[in-house]
Amino acid sequence: MSSLYYANALFSKYPASSSVFATGAFPEQTSCAFASNPQRQGYGAGSGASFAASMQGLYPGGGGMAGQSAAGVYAAGYGLEPSSFNMHCAPFEQNLSGVCPGDSAKAAGAKEQRDSDLAAESNFRIYPWMRSSGTDRKRGRQTYTRYQTLELEKEFHYNRYLTRRRRIEIAHALCLTERQIKIWFQNRRMKWKKENKTAGPGTTAQDRAEAEEEEEE
């Protein structure tokens, strides 16, 4: 009896609390009815209307805001239009449409092929026995500059045959090798002999003696 008395006294102390919520705001439903209510199963037009009615019952002065949509509420609060919510998606979609997936795949394949070729070249080693050292190997023709040709012509004018010491000096002065100097003088002597075929046999013997002396040195 004492507990029931205190409970009745407690509930009777707040008689106006039931008038805070409207009668139709939160209708009492059984557990089965709550599960089978189609308005509770989704966010349809009926659920929005009941929610707006309940909001009007709770906040009489805020009925205008309860009837607005979520985009309208955010637009009114931040000064944005509803169409601005999807603006960030447009450039991204345009970029995706402009990129061809086949190009990226081809670029990736070409890069992998190039990397594999470079790795193979770096691992490949050429040994001396792999290089051709026979007479069939062609040598590139040496080209002389105008200054080098002029100096060689001057030297040939005074000496058609060079000693080894003089050949080394000319090679260092003209930035050439001894072999290049020797080949140039041989070719120049052949040209000079063709130009002077009418020379006597004494001159030929003298040239042969000078050539033998050059080979010995």
Swiss-Prot record:
Belongs to the Antp homeobox family. Forms a DNA-binding heterodimer with transcription factor PBX1. Coiled coil: none annotated. Residues 137-196 bind DNA. It is found in: Nucleus. One of its GO terms (molecular function) is DNA-binding transcription activator activity, RNA polymerase II-specific. This is Homeobox protein Hox-B7. GO terms for biological process: anterior/posterior pattern specification; embryonic skeletal system morphogenesis; myeloid cell differentiation; positive regulation of branching involved in ureteric bud morphogenesis; regulation of transcription by RNA polymerase II. One of its GO terms (cellular component) is cytosol. It comes from Gorilla gorilla gorilla. A motif (Antp-type hexapeptide) lies at residues 126-131. Pfam families: Homeodomain. Its main location: nucleus. InterPro entries: Antp_homeobox (IPR050296), HD (IPR001356), HD_metazoa (IPR020479), Homeobox_antennapedia (IPR017995), Homeobox_Antennapedia_CS (IPR001827), Homeobox_CS (IPR017970), Homeodomain-like_sf (IPR009057). Residues 193-217 are annotated as: Disordered. Sequence-specific transcription factor which is part of a developmental regulatory system that provides cells with specific positional identities on the anterior-posterior axis. Keywords: Developmental protein, DNA-binding, Homeobox, Nucleus, Transcription, Transcription regulation. It comes from the Eukaryota.
